[in-house]
Swiss-Prot record:
Protein name: UDP-GlcNAc:betaGal beta-1,3-N-acetylglucosaminyltransferase 8
Subcellular location: Golgi apparatus membrane
Recorded metabolic or biological pathway in which this protein acts: Protein modification; protein glycosylation
UniProt KW Endoplasmic reticulum keyword: no
Gene from which the chain derives: B3gnt8
Organism: Mus musculus
Amino acid sequence: MRCRKCQLCLSALLTLLGLKVYIEWTSESWLKKAEPRGALPSPTPPNAEPTLPTNLSARLGQTGPLSSAYWNQQQRQLGVLPSTDCQTWGTVAASEILDFILYPQELRRFLLSAACRSFPLWLPAGEGSPVASCSDKDVPYLLLAVKSEPGHFAARQAVRETWGSPVAGTRLLFLLGSPLGMGGPDLRSLVTWESRRYGDLLLWDFLDVPYNRTLKDLLLLTWLSHHCPDVNFVLQVQDDAFVHIPALLEHLQTLPPTWARSLYLGEIFTQAKPLRKPGGPFYVPKTFFEGDYPAYASGGGYVISGRLAPWLLQAAARVAPFPFDDVYTGFCFRALGLAPRAHPGFLTAWPAERTRDPCAVRGLLLVHPVSPQDTIWLWRHLWVPELQC
C-alpha cells in the first residue's frame, strides 16, 4: 500500500515537473518569436569619445586606390596644415592642378588662401564694442552662433527681436567678415554703430563671401576655446533660419549624457555626391575631389557639443581645406570618429509657401530659409494663445 502511494506521489511530481518545463519552454519560444514584432528597438549606440589617429586616410574613406584628384592626394600626404606662410598651400595647389585656371573664380580664390586660418578681429579696442567673454557665473547652456554678412542688417535685427531674444541659458552672437567687401558699399560706419549698440558681433578681417564660411566656423571654435570653453552646446546657424528655441532647449536637456558630450545634431545628409555641373553654386571639379561626401549636417543649422571645440580645431588642422563649410565640418567629425545624429525637427529646405504656417513650425526645431519679414510674422503668431493647430 505504501509503495503504491509512493508511486502515485512520484508520478504526480514527475507530471508537475514535466508541465513546468513545458510551460517555461513554450513561454520562452513565444517570447523569442514575438520579439521582432513587439519589442522596443535597440537604442542607438552612443558616440564614442573623440580620437584622432595618426593616419586619417581610412577614417576619411580613402581605403581603395588613391585618386588623382588634388584634395585626395593632399589628404593622403597631409600631416598638419602650415601655421606660417599659409599662402604656400594655395600657391602649390594653383601650380599642381592642371586645369586650375578653368575653376570658377570663387573656388580659385578660396584655394589660394584656404590654409590661412588666423585673422584678427576687425574692430580694434576702442573702435567698437568688444564681445565679452563668458563669465564663470554666466556660462550659456546654448550659444546661438549666427553666420551673417555685413549687409544683412534686417536679418540680424529680425533674429534679435524673435528667436534670438534673451532667454535664460542662451546667448546670441553673429559671425561676420570684414564690412569692406569687394566693390560693394562701405559699411564700416554702420557695422561699427551696430557693434556698439548691441555688443553681439564677432567680426574678423577677412573677405566675407560664401566660400569663407568655413573660416567663421574655425574662428568661432578658437574664440570658444579662449572665451567660452564651458558652454554646453553651440547652435551654428544661418541668419535666414527660424529656430524654435524652447523646443530645442527641451530636446537638449533630455539627451543622455553620453550623447550630449559628443553631439552633432541636425538634418543629416548621407552618401551625398559632389555636383559636377559647371556653373552651379556647389560645383566641384573632378580634378579637385573624387568620392562621396561624409555624412554631414546641413549648414542651414545644426548643434554641436561645446566641449568638442578644441578637438575640432585639432582635426581641422589635419583635414585638407574644402570649400563648403557643412561638408568640411562633416569631414572633421569623421576624422574624430564621431557620427552625426539626425533629428526630423531640422528642415533646411523649407518651402516658401509654408513660411507663414505657425502650426507647421510649432512641432519643429529649426526651419530654413525664412525671410526677416516672415521670421517676425511667425514669431508673433506662434505664441498666440488662440492658435488652434
